[in-house]
């Protein structure tokens, strides 16, 4: 079973413009303790936007 404080938790990425939650991914907490920001394609905005980790 997974530990309560998993080292690679699942995170959701939301578009900063339209706030839709488009992507689910995993991250390593030791390497990236801060919120993750990636530039990815948003199908609702029809262009590449900054997606930020949500809680």
Swiss-Prot record:
<comment type="similarity">
    <text>Belongs to the bacterial ribosomal protein bL33 family.</text>
</comment>
<dbReference type="GO" id="GO:0005737">
    <property type="term" value="C:cytoplasm"/>
</dbReference>
<dbReference type="InterPro" id="IPR001705">
    <property type="entry name" value="Ribosomal_bL33"/>
</dbReference>
<dbReference type="InterPro" id="IPR011332">
    <property type="entry name" value="Ribosomal_zn-bd"/>
</dbReference>
<dbReference type="InterPro" id="IPR018264">
    <property type="entry name" value="Ribosomal_bL33_CS"/>
</dbReference>
<dbReference type="Pfam" id="PF00471">
    <property type="entry name" value="Ribosomal_L33"/>
</dbReference>
<keyword id="KW-0689">Ribosomal protein</keyword>
<dbReference type="GO" id="GO:1990904">
    <property type="term" value="C:ribonucleoprotein complex"/>
</dbReference>
<dbReference type="GO" id="GO:0006412">
    <property type="term" value="P:translation"/>
</dbReference>
<dbReference type="InterPro" id="IPR038584">
    <property type="entry name" value="Ribosomal_bL33_sf"/>
</dbReference>
<dbReference type="GO" id="GO:0003735">
    <property type="term" value="F:structural constituent of ribosome"/>
</dbReference>
<protein>
    <recommendedName>
        <fullName>Large ribosomal subunit protein bL33</fullName>
    </recommendedName>
</protein>
<keyword id="KW-0687">Ribonucleoprotein</keyword>
<dbReference type="GO" id="GO:0005840">
    <property type="term" value="C:ribosome"/>
</dbReference>
